């Protein structure tokens, strides 16, 4: 950990001491999916991300809480002591749990426990890829706890059809509290035009995993800093602005790269300046 912070500090100095400047765009809410730093504990992750001026983080279920609590994962099974420790970490680093996922309830009991868990942290958005027969259950508890449930999708496969914008859009018409969670990277990996997906879900987007890639349709593609790939991120931002989207723009890296922390900070800068 002692080796990471000086590197981040140096990079911040190189960029002008902060990710903010006079050209920043203040209306975008920017978060980082903590899976991007899955090799670290959540405590370390929050310390790394704190200087970047984020609005929050999207926590994923299986990350270890702290080296001092190696058996604690970010799940509803956390004890009160563990939860209090995490709440103190959020306060210390001036961050919050903006969203939680990707998670699977698996049953009504599981859905209820997840909703109770995130509400305890003041989180308002759950990201799930649960099976379709559980969507009415998610709607029930989202209404009870004042949450938005955003349906995620991975690459095009046989698990579900959530990657199909027209199909998901039709499903979402049945629910008030359930929306879509477009993952720009997974759409590109599947050869699905991200802009089409965003337009098809217009007004029904609860969260976005915002990414860029060096090639479109490459199933083995990797993320690159926003604005440095071939995806038209600026046009997608304009489309989301047109829709009046007010949710989080969640930065996520799913592969380990040597420049990971620097790349994440570049993504934050891009979202602040465009």
Where are the regions that the model predicts?
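Bacterial Sec-dependent N-terminal signal peptides
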Residues: 1-25
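Active-site-proximal loop/turn and secondary-structure-junction residues that shape catalytic pockets
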Residues: 36, 61-63, 103-106, 132-134, ...
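The substrate-binding groove and active-site-proximal loops of carbohydrate-active enzymes
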Residues: 36, 73, 101, 124, ...
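Glycine-rich, proline-tolerant flexible connector loops at the mouths of alpha/beta enzymes
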Residues: 59-84
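A short acidic, helix-capping loop that chelates divalent metal ions and anchors anionic groups
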Residues: 65-72, 151, 158, 189, ...
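Metal-dependent catalytic neighborhoods of phosphoester/phosphodiester hydrolases
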Residues: 68-72, 108-112, 260-261
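Active-site acidic/histidine proton-transfer and metal-coordination neighborhood
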Residues: 83, 93-179, 188-191
């Amino acid at each position: 950990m002692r080796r990471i912070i000086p590197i981040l500090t140096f990079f911040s100095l190189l960029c002008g001491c902060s990710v903010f400047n006079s050209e920043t765009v203040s209306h975008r809410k920017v978060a980082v999916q903590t899976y991007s730093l899955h090799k670290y504990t959540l405590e370390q992750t929050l310390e790394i991300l704190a200087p970047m001026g984020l609005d929050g983080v999207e926590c994923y279920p299986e990350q270890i809480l702290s080296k001092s609590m190696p058996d604690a994962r970010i799940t509803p099974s956390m004890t009160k002591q563990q939860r209090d420790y995490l709440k103190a970490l959020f306060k210390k680093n001036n961050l919050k749990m903006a969203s939680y996922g990707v998670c699977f309830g698996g049953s009504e009991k599981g859905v209820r426990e997840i909703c109770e868990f995130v509400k305890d942290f003041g989180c308002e958005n759950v990201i799930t890829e649960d099976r379709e027969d559980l969507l009415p259950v998610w709607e029930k508890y989202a209404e009870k706890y004042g949450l938005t449930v955003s349906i995620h999708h991975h690459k095009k496969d046989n698990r579900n059809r959530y990657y199909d914008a027209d199909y998901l859009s039709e499903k979402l018409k049945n629910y008030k509290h359930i929306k879509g969670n477009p993952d720009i990277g997974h759409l590109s990996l599947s050869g699905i035009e991200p802009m089409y997906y965003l337009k098809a879900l217009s007004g029904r987007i609860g969260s976005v995993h915002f990414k860029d890639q060096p090639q479109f349709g490459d199933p083995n593609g990797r993320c690159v800093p926003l604005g440095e790939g071939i995806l038209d991120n600026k046009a997608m931002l304009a489309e989301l602005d047109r829709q009046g989207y007010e949710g989080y723009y969640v930065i996520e890296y799913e592969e380990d790269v040597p420049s990971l922390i620097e790349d994440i900070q570049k993504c934050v800068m891009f979202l602040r300046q465009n």
